[in-house]
Amino acid sequence: MMRVEISFSYGEKKALDGVDFSAREGRLLAVIGPNGSGKSTLLKCIAGILKPEGRIELDGKDITVLSPRARAKLVSYVPQSSLPEFDFTVEEFVEMGTYFTSGSVERALKEVGMWERRSESVLKLSGGEYQLVLIARALAQGGRVLLLDEPTSHLDVNNALEVMGLVRSLGRERIVVAVLHDLNLTLRYADDVLILKKGKVTWFGPTEELTPEVLQRVYGIKFEFVRGNSGTAVVPSL
């Protein structure tokens, strides 16, 4: 289990204020909230890119005191993606900048279904395929915690569903925390939801307990949940 109890400021501006939650293996945690609510900052604090006040515990041990290398072996981070700029093969791209061990790149690419395309240029990949390669690069580190910052933000519906299906499967043996902008994907794939607004936790709990009224208080828009054969959809209420 991962326990987070942190605050963080950019200068005098409080970006995270007493954020307190836990995440477990086998349960995908989605972090949602309005723009500027601190979602990306939260992931960067857990990943060790930013240094917050407080504690981040993994199995009861504070990982904020670890060296960057030791932290990277426990926590893997996939930032918001942009299109690739340089002509590397898929395998070369995964090997770049990661603390991987012998065989870990192959295992990671196989886990996301991209091993057979390891010799292809990343410049020729679709947006969804490139996102899978980014996830593989994080998996190659072998961390127990996987952080994903808006993994579907630039994808069409079909690619987004494919990526989120993979993300959910990865969480069976890992602690997975994903910032999501799509409320429908949140309801469909997340086991637990953490809602941030102005750097504070406004709601945290199992997805099945999330209500339209909670979302209205956060986003200032009336919603309703429409249940169908493919799951529950979130739609604005007129």
Where are these regions (language model features)?
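Conserved ABC ATPase "signature" region
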Residues: 103-118, 123
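Helix-to-loop junction immediately C-terminal to a conserved catalytic motif
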Residues: 47
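Conserved ABC transporter NBD signature motif
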Residues: 54-62, 71
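Catalytic Walker B motif of ABC-type/P-loop ATPase nucleotide-binding domains
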Residues: 146-150
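The feature captures the beta-strand-to-loop junction immediately N-terminal to the Walker
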Residues: 32-34
